[in-house]
A protein has these predicted regions:
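PLP-dependent amino-acid enzyme catalytic core
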Residues: 1-173
């Protein structure tokens, strides 16, 4: 099952999500990416549903998606200007924070990564947090960068857990 926000992906992207055949069903959700993610999390948390079917995710809710992404960063760092030991600095689009989380995993595993900076669009949940506010999910705003249109990035709590406190998290990003 694939869930995606109706009207928030291009026709080409929608085709790519819908063309898999009989064993994969794609559903357009009247809402945002956050709404799709909420539905997926509800399904994963439903014990009756989990007893009937095997569930998993292919997005960054799952560490199974994040670990291969960490390998991309290790590969990039290994080939960065051909200079061993020279850290690779990153600017990562925010979205659901899966890529940023993967970068932190890669660095924790010893990949020579320098600064990890986040790029945000009009969905400013994280800039509000970094500007000294409390973390508070925001309604999703539709932009041209639909992969970044997330008002409640799931991996924020994961990043928060990996740092001692919010000050350390802010310093790391």
């Amino acid at each position: 099952v694939i869930l995606y926000p109706d009207g928030r992906v291009s026709p080409r992207q929608a085709h790519g999500l819908e063309c898999w055949g009989d064993n994969v069903r794609a559903f357009r959700v009247d809402g945002s990416f956050d709404d799709c993610q909420r539905l997926a999390k509800q399904a994963l948390a439903d014990p009756d549903l989990r007893a009937r079917v095997t569930l998993g995710t292919a997005n960054s809710i799952s560490l199974g998606r994040m670990l291969p992404q960490a390998a991309y960063y290790a590969h990039a760092a290994a080939h960065h200007f051909g200079s061993p030991g020279r850290p690779l600095h990153l600017i990562v689009p925010t979205g659901n924070l899966g890529n940023a989380s993967a970068a932190f995993v890669a660095r924790a595993m010893g990949t020579p990564l320098g600064e990890i900076r986040l790029a945000c669009n009009a969905n400013d949940t994280l800039p509000r947090f970094f500007d000294g506010g409390d973390y508070a999910a925001q309604p999703t705003r539709t932009t041209l960068a639909n992969a970044m249109d997330v008002g409640a990035p799931s991996n924020f709590e994961r990043l928060r857990h990996w740092h001692r406190d919010d000050a350390q998290l802010c310093a790391a990003l």
